[in-house]
UniProtKB/Swiss-Prot annotation:
InterPro entries: BON_dom, Lipoprotein_DolP, Transpt-assoc_nodulatn_dom_bac
BON domain: residues covered: 48-117, 126-193
Name of the protein described by the UniProt record: Outer membrane lipoprotein DolP
One protein family per Pfam: BON
Gene: dolP
Membrane topology listed for this record: Lipid-anchor
């Protein structure tokens, strides 16, 4: 059977498109494996923290006012939960703390929610970019291992979590504070010394 040049091109393009999905899956899987392998927490602890984040956000979202008017994200590191986002008033902020503390497995809650309107998608994107820049600078700087510090940004504020020494914490905060667009750096570390 002889294929026309047009059919050969169609088959080649189809195969290329199909294989691109495979490549993305392989690269994505490799990135996840690298993240898990370089994180100082055990794989089990990483899974526990991810599960805890989901459970806390789920518990908080059950409050009707938070669900309707707030934006709450939970970040967990070794069972210590950081709440970030926006809520309509201080009573709702307190409710979020109580709900988070009620989740099994939560050791401590750091409530950094702000009483303000929800941030825009544009700000969320800027925050994602800030996080990327901070992690990149830590990687290049060398005073603190980027894999030892979990970085999250919210409305221009950078939150740093992890188990580090005082000098590593200060170095991480110094690196983050020098990134353009960072309004404030908040350390949520457990100190090893």
């Amino acid at each position: 059977m002889t294929l026309s040049p047009l059919k050969k091109l169609a088959i080649l393009l189809g195969a290329t498109i199909f294989l691109q999905g495979c490549v993305a899956a392989v690269i994505g899987g490799g990135a996840v494996a690298a993240k898990v392998a370089t994180d100082p927490r055990t794989t089990g602890t990483q899974i526990d923290d991810e599960t805890l984040e989901f459970k806390v956000e789920n518990a908080v979202e059950k409050d009707a006012q938070i669900k309707a008017e707030g934006r709450v994200n939970a970040v967990s590191y070794n069972g210590r939960v950081l709440l970030i986002g926006q809520v309509p008033n201080s009573d709702v902020k307190d409710t979020a703390t109580a709900l988070a503390k009620g989740v099994e497995g939560v050791n401590e809650v750091y409530n950094e929610l702000t009483v303000s309107p929800k941030i825009s998608f544009a700000q969320i994107s800027k925050d994602s970019w800030l996080t990327t820049q901070v992690k990149s600078k830590m990687f290049v700087d060398g005073r603190v291992k980027a894999t030892d510090v979990k970085v999250i940004s919210e409305n221009g504020e950078v939150f740093l979590l992890g188990n580090v020494t005082q000098s590593q914490a200060n170095a991480a905060a110094d690196i983050a504070s020098k990134i353009s667009g960072v309004k404030k750096v908040i350390k949520v570390f457990k100190y090893l010394d």
